[in-house]
A protein has these predicted regions:
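Radical SAM/AdoMet-radical enzyme domain recognition
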Residues: 56-76, 83-196
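Canonical Radical SAM [4Fe-4S] cluster-binding loop centered on the CxxxCxxC motif
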Residues: 15-54
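Glycine-centered loop/turn positions within well-structured domains
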Residues: 33, 136-137, 262, 288
Length: 339
């Protein structure tokens, strides 16, 4: 029967036939920024208790089982991952797992200037830095921290030590930074690095999301193409972004469009939260507790069975979530999921 075949294959296949190959590991829900599209108001923040956060050894064990089931690429996230002390030790542990092909990280860049070299030595391949404005006052308004020069130094340091790829992610929000699209593109082009614009998603802690604030990817590419000759490269299988290459060879532009053009049909990503919950979809409302298995004597097979079952139940996609179709945001924070 179908259920039996799923278990015998021992791969992370869901009901739609999608196979998970990429994992995002959140190592903390804490962040020293307060980006308005991510974090709730300070008096409404409830951090995960320290004793509930997975240890590096527990993460290593879970990732090892996931690797045996076909996970090949790992991205370390937060909150802000570099708030986790000695993160390079975890990078080394994950990079040493035989079938893991790459370990990358997404960061706000605050600690990147200081940590880039040792992370690279530990086995970090590349880094994606969140950068939503190049204007100091606006950067502070969006992120809650006056830190633009420090973040920019972190990006340059990452390039200097040889992390590759270095990418920029920018969330485009109508009325906040949609007039900076060309400035952000030019900044990335000067460094010949990729920049990806992300549509504003209904996962903000402040509850400010609505469709009127979403800048569709089509609008972004129209803005860019009026200035820069672009060559469409399409969207690779299971990739989150559609890509355009600048014809003069100075980097490329990506669009991540979960709202206007969802890419759920061939999604190959799953997420592990900082407190050990497996999330098969960014917009899912069902968590699968792996920490309980790890801390209560579960065997490797127990862990694998729980993971395979969780992935099998992966939702069809964002377009099928009734709370999104109805146009309102779920009261759930991106920092707690893992960005």
């Amino acid at each position: 029967m179908q259920g039996t075949e799923r278990r015998e294959e021992r791969v992370l296949r869901d009901r739609k036939g999608r196979v998970a190959r990429k994992l995002r590991v959140s190592v903390t829900d804490r962040c020293n920024f307060a980006c308005l599209f991510c974090m709730p108001e300070k008096d409404k923040i409830s951090w995960i208790p320290k004793e509930e956060i997975l240890t590096f050894e527990e993460i290593e064990r879970i990732v090892g089982v996931l690797a045996s089931l076909g996970i090949e690429k790992v991205r370390i996230t937060g909150g802000e991952p570099l708030l986790r002390r000695d993160l390079e030790e975890l990078v080394d542990k994950i990079a040493s797992i035989r079938s893991i092909r790459s370990v990358d990280m997404t960061t706000n860049g605050w600690h990147l200037e200081r940590k880039a070299e040792e992370l690279r030595r530990a086995g970090l391949r590349g880094v994606t830095v969140s950068l939503h404005s190049l204007r100091s006052d606006r950067f502070a308004k969006i992120s809650g921290v006056d830190a633009l020069p420090r973040v920019l130094r972190g990006i340059d340091r990452a390039l200097g030590v040889g992390l590759n790829p270095v990418k920029i992610n920018s969330v485009a929000i109508r009325g906040y930074n949609d007039d900076e699209i060309l400035e952000l593109i030019e900044y990335a082009r000067e460094r010949r690095i990729s920049i990806r614009f992300i549509e504003f998603m209904p996962l903000d802690g402040l509850g400010m999301w609505n469709y009127d604030r979403v800048v569709p990817g089509k609008e972004i590419i129209e803005t860019a193409s009026r200035v820069y000759p672009l060559q469409p490269m399409g969207r690779g299988a299971s990739e989150t972004s559609s890509t355009w290459r600048f014809k003069d060879g100075r980097g490329d532009l990506g669009l991540i469009t979960p709202m206007s053009e969802p890419f759920c049909d061939d999604c190959d990503r799953i997420r592990l939260t900082a407190d050990g919950k497996l999330l098969s979809c960014l917009f899912d409302t069902e968590y699968h507790d792996l920490r309980h298995v790890v801390r209560n004597g579960g065997t490797q097979k127990d862990l694998a069975d729980r993971i395979v079952d969780a992935v099998w139940k992966k939702p069809d996609g964002v377009g099928y979530m009734p709370w999104i179709k109805d146009g309102w945001a779920k009261p759930r924070n991106m920092n707690a999921i893992g960005g």
